[in-house]
Amino acid sequence: MAFFDLPLEELKKYRPERYEEKDFDEFWEETLAESEKFPLDPVFERMESHLKTVEAYDVTFSGYRGQRIKGWLLVPKLEEEKLPCVVQYIGYNGGRGFPHDWLFWPSMGYICFVMDTRGQGSGWLKGDTPDYPEGPVDPQYPGFMTRGILDPRTYYYRRVFTDAVRAVEAAASFPQVDQERIVIAGGSQGGGIALAVSALSKKAKALLCDVPFLCHFRRAVQLVDTHPYAEITNFLKTHRDKEEIVFRTLSYFDGVNFAARAKIPALFSVGLMDNICPPSTVFAAYNYYAGPKEIRIYPYNNHEGGGSFQAVEQVKFLKKLFEKG
């Protein structure tokens, strides 16, 4: 894929008009308050992972409305009494997989909490958490992007984002986690989830947001025909009369609107040839991000973004942040 979006100098200034409903904050306050009525009840069950330098725990905690969510907690076998923690969110249709799939952060001296994404985990890494839709489910295009999309209260990502906030709380409850060094991280869908949590969680202290999905929906579906955004396009291709209803729902889940409310230090990344999460949708979120921020730009990369290069940048970013703090 060659360059297809705005020139870089325009991307750096790109701040489209934000569309959000007046009750955006109220919607999320009520959503989180509903789930806080249920005990978090985190369970950390030590397991035999055959890893020599990492202790692995099979995690279960209460997410949206008390529904039980799976995860992993990976603790490096170090002498420190308290360790920083990275809460990791997963890309589209991936699940938590196995503990040995998530060894990068433990090898860097961080506890890693991996949240399984409800209903997903049959596309690349396996998942173990079912989704529990909100009442009757309207017709949808195959996938997750249009599940419950005719009402923000029934939309799939309402449940996912709530799970993700509760995941930070579950991670924070583990005795060895340093409360002042909790990081939320993810790429693609995981980046979009982490971006939402950066505005919704009071416990997260830093954000690592790579090639984020779930940002500036209307431009994304009008600019690219790749999946997963194409799920929305194909839904509207059939349901020709639902455009405004769909984009109204999506406004409650748009990373651009969460970015405008986020305050914690953040490191973003973008691939300028990314035809899955187009550069302008990433820059829309980045340019509205209200906290201290940096972005790493990879001109000749598609959705893989910076790969291992970005991982090095993240380690340096957190080292500088926490040493300064």
Curated annotation (Swiss-Prot):
A Pfam family annotated for this UniProt entry: AXE1
Residues the record lists as binding paraoxon: S188
UniProt-annotated binding residues for substrate: Y92
Keyword match Lyase: no
Reactions it catalyzes: Deacetylation of xylans and xylo-oligosaccharides; cephalosporin C + H2O = deacetylcephalosporin C + acetate + H(+)
Annotated EC: 3.1.1.41, 3.1.1.72
Effect caused by changing Q88A: Minimal change in catalytic efficiency toward acetate substrates
Biophysicochemical property: pH dependence: Optimum pH is 6.5. Half-maximal activity between pH 5.0-7.5.
Quaternary structure, from the entry: Homohexamer, formed by a trimer of dimers. Also exists as a homodimer.
Stated name of the protein: Cephalosporin-C deacetylase
UniProt source species: Thermotoga maritima (strain ATCC 43589 / DSM 3109 / JCM 10099 / NBRC 100826 / MSB8)
Gene: axeA
